[in-house]
Amino acid sequence: MAESSDMQELFVQATYEEILKLASSVNHEQIRETISSSSPQKILTGTMLTLGALLTTLIVKKKGTKFLTTKVQSNVAYLAEMVVWKANQTVKTICDEVLHQRKVIEKLQCLDKMCSEIEKLRYDMEHFQGMDVTKELIQMCEQKMIDIDSKVKEVERSCDRRIRDYDWKIATLTAHPTQQLPAHIDIINQHIEDDAETQIIQQHMNKQARVKLNSRNRL
């Protein structure tokens, strides 16, 4: 039993020393190359085994962190950063593969190209032959409004002239009536008198006829 315990202690001591030796001797360049060229599965497995073994030996040896020198701490921190970087790269690669399979990247590139062409077309339209089209359009609209105002004023002046002309004609007709008007009125009055006499004669004749008819009925 004692021999088994000695073997375990020897193994732990060897593992602990090997891990510390590796952590102390490796540099950032080696860590970066190893992480960059290794698969995510291998990196995750190796990292977990290394950190697990180091933690186990520290607990068993009960030596705490006093053996973690500045270089070891720097390497451990850099290793963690590289693991995170590798994870980000792996996720990006997976996303790129999925997007490529669905041809999303090509569509996005096509949209970017179309947007660029539209922007170029808009610029060309706004600066046709070196002119600022927007400014030119505004000036044209302003000039057109001025022309419309001028036409409206001309129409107003023409209407005023026509109104004054009609007013003058009406005033002239009112101030100088025709000389034939009294004669025309006399003729109308004569017709009225003739109609009245005719009606009186007709009424008298009708009365005489009724008298004769009544006389016959009595006989």
From Swiss-Prot:
GO cellular component terms, semicolon-separated: extracellular region; host caveola; host cell rough endoplasmic reticulum membrane; membrane
Top-rank lineage group of the source organism: Viruses
Transmembrane region(s): 48-74
GO MF entries: channel activity; toxin activity
Subunit field text: Homotetramer. Interacts with the immature particle in the viroplasm. Interacts with host CAV1, early and late in infection. Interacts with host integrin ITGA1/ITGB1 heterodimer. Interacts with host integrin ITGA2/ITGB1 heterodimer. Interaction with microtubules blocks trafficking to the Golgi apparatus.
Similarity comment text for this entry: Belongs to the rotavirus NSP4 family.
Name this polypeptide is given: Non-structural glycoprotein 4
